[in-house]
Amino acid sequence: MIDNYSTAREKMLREQIVARGVTDMATLDAILEVPRHFFVDEGQRMRAYGDYPLSITEGQTISQPYIVAYMTSLLQLTASDTVLEIGTGSGYQAAILSKICRQVYTVECIHSLLNKARKVFDSLRYFNIRSKYDDGSRGWSEFAPYDAIIVTAGSPEIPTPLLDQLADGGRMVIPVGPRYEQVLKRVTKEGDDFVVEDLAPVRFVDLVGVHGWK
């Protein structure tokens, strides 16, 4: 079974991610290393490497592998970076980030999801991930500024606290727009200014919070 999962992961990388143009080697290496099937329910493990999102619990999903890889590559991460993730979900995205950068901070507003993700982090010995239960739209100011911020839920607008917590030269990737239809944006902080790029149409679950969907 281990060989089957490894083969499925290699096929996923080759056919779903590299074939669609993701070339960042740090991202590709992380995708190949992290066992995605550990982040879904046991009954769905054989589907973990398919070209689609999967339901987890509490009405949430684990994103399609390509989207995880694409968003990660847009952050242009280095080994010395600290990253803030908004929306821990299954924990898979945080695990990918942890293989690339120095420290990951992740915030989740659904307690049962966070507890489940923490157990997987511990079992896989991903010790450079720090997590908390909170309103992710507020960010995590204690450890700011961050070299990169990734938001894995759709927001009606870019939350001001997240902009405030981005380091100079930092990058943020976030889905912005109405429910069920957002635009993936990359925000780069340049001094006192923010450069915003519109990249792709996407569909994410809601970012629920004071600075997201109420």
UniProtKB/Swiss-Prot annotation:
GO cellular component: cytoplasm
Enzymatic reactions: [protein]-L-isoaspartate + S-adenosyl-L-methionine = [protein]-L-isoaspartate alpha-methyl ester + S-adenosyl-L-homocysteine
Enzyme Commission code(s) on record: 2.1.1.77
Top class in the EC scheme: transferase
Pfam families: PCMT (PF01135)
Taxonomic superkingdom: Bacteria
SUPFAM superfamilies: S-adenosyl-L-methionine-dependent methyltransferases
InterPro entries cross-referenced by the UniProt entry: PCMT (IPR000682), SAM-dependent_MTases_sf (IPR029063)
Active-site annotation: S63
A GO BP entry: protein modification process
Keywords, sorted A to Z: Cytoplasm, Methyltransferase, S-adenosyl-L-methionine, Transferase
One MF term in the entry's GO annotations: protein-L-isoaspartate (D-aspartate) O-methyltransferase activity
Compartment(s) where it occurs, according to its Swiss-Prot or TrEMBL record: Cytoplasm
Family: Belongs to the methyltransferase superfamily. L-isoaspartyl/D-aspartyl protein methyltransferase family.
Function of the molecule: Catalyzes the methyl esterification of L-isoaspartyl residues in peptides and proteins that result from spontaneous decomposition of normal L-aspartyl and L-asparaginyl residues. It plays a role in the repair and/or degradation of damaged proteins.
Protein's name according to its UniProt entry: Protein-L-isoaspartate O-methyltransferase
Organism: Desulfotalea psychrophila (strain LSv54 / DSM 12343)
Lineage: Bacteria, Pseudomonadati, Thermodesulfobacteriota, Desulfobulbia, Desulfobulbales
